[in-house]
């Protein structure tokens, strides 16, 4: 009934309707009963200070509520409020109980954690104690081993001393025994010698008589043997001479035997030369694609693949300038059509700086034309001496036996085909050169000759007159260098990184940009030097711990290659023009010298100091339009352009 006192009012009470208003207080009603009693003081007890006004209002409100039409609803509202309070109290009680249970579980968990930590600490202490005990046991065991080792060493030392003493005693005994035996032997020999000498002195006459009798008997035996043999041979020869049939048969047999011996000797030599020309390989040939019987027996699968292979593109794997590509492609097409139509092959000269692809083009030309190729070097001819002429004839005889046609490639031809008038060459080398000129003087439908040289101006004039086509291989420019870098980067880095068992790894960076940058930094380098740079990338990756090729490693290899190239140029410059050594870029056309704008270029410095002369773009072409020779020098060994010449 708390609503009677004006407490616990909420939204539910408002929904049931407002309670009836309290009646207004009557004036003079408060304390009226007290005034009727007079001024007599009220008795003082525990209820003396109690104010019954609230009870009166409550009783009045209860009476009014009983007569009100909302009495039942108010009662229900009061009951519902009481139930709500009870439910709230019960929920709080449940929460208190849950909190108590949670507190108990936390206490149990804390106890378990403490117990676990205690067990862990006990375990750790046990392990530490066990380790300490094990350490003590190991130390005791090691001390025992050391003591045992010391004891064994002491015993071994004593045994060695004992053995040494016994060996010394035995050696002394043996020496004494040998000494006594030697004395006894000497005494015995001396006694026997004395006895033998005495016996010989006493029997000297008998011994001489025995020697005389033996010599007489031997002489009689030899004389009788000679007489008997002479008689037998004489009778046999007399019987042979008197019989004409035997004499005729003997003469015919000896004649046939001599004819057979000489015929077999000559036939064997002819057969050997035929087999060598057809099946063997001349000694001057270093490498050939021509199939021999021995090679077919050793590698039948590879030989069958080569026989079934189709002609390849002449420029596959070869990077050249566009103008040079067009020219060599025309040469390849002409050579292939010449083979198809069984025409006469032309002789070709490939000249230019080293490492520009001359040998590779010769191989590709042979494979593209369906011909066999054979590679020889000019430096192998001079050491042969007197055998050079025979070897040269064998080489061309072997070339004429090719059914598919043979491309004979001579690398470093300037080492052999030098000028006979000015160069000091031996008589044997001169004879070999004459034999070579004889075979080169006429065209053939069996072979074509391809010469490669870095110094073609040293050729004999007879060689120059026999050359049909001259092709100049130049150093690669920016575009060709970038193509070369990409080609060798793909062959030496990308393919090993994705194929094969022993793979190398490649870091992530812009490969195209890096190839372009390397092509820019390798200005002046040949194709061979760029290929060596790619191989150094691969070797650096294999030499690293993780096998990863990074951009920094590539940059280091490029810097090293550039430094090596500059060092080579310094060496080349130090040789000087009088030593017969030329700069790789000298004697070439103007488009190659575009990177040499000033003579102060550090790659080819002027010996006279600072120089401002420019290079003639017509140098080495023979087409200089100026009034002066383009071979003029600035005074420091640096050629410059005379007035009227086009400059680079």
From Swiss-Prot:
A molecular-function term among this protein's GO annotations: ATP hydrolysis activity
Cited CDD domains:
RecA-like_ATAD3-like
Q: Which residues lie within the membrane without crossing it?
A: 247-264
User: Where expressed (tissues)?
Assistant: Tends to be down-regulated in differentiated cells and re-expressed in pluripotent stem cells or cancer cells (at protein level).
Indicate, by first and last residue, each region the UniProt record lists as having compositional bias (Pro residues): 17-26
Membrane topology per the record? Peripheral membrane protein
Alphabetically sorted, this entry's keywords are:
Acetylation, ATP-binding, Coiled coil, Membrane, Mitochondrion, Mitochondrion inner membrane, Nucleotide-binding
Coiled-coil residues: 69-214
Set out the biological process GO terms recorded for this chain's protein.
mitochondrion organization
Where, by residue number, does ATP bind? 352-359
Q: Does the keyword tRNA processing apply?
A: no
Main subcellular localisation: mitochondrion
> Which ranges does the record list as Mitochondrial intermembrane topological domains?
2-246, 265-648
Copy out the induction comment: Up-regulated by MYC.
Which PANTHER family does the record match to this protein? ATPASE FAMILY AAA DOMAIN-CONTAINING PROTEIN 3B, PUTATIVE ATP-ASE
Quaternary structure annotation from Swiss-Prot or TrEMBL:
Forms heterooligomers with ATAD3A. Interacts with components of the mitochondrial ribosome, including MRPL11 and MRPS18B, and with other proteins involved in mitochondrial RNA metabolism, possibly via interaction with ATAD3A. Interacts with GADD45GIP1.
Protein name listed in UniProt: ATPase family AAA domain-containing protein 3B
UniProt organism field: Homo sapiens
Taxonomic lineage of this organism?
Eukaryota, Metazoa, Chordata, Craniata, Vertebrata
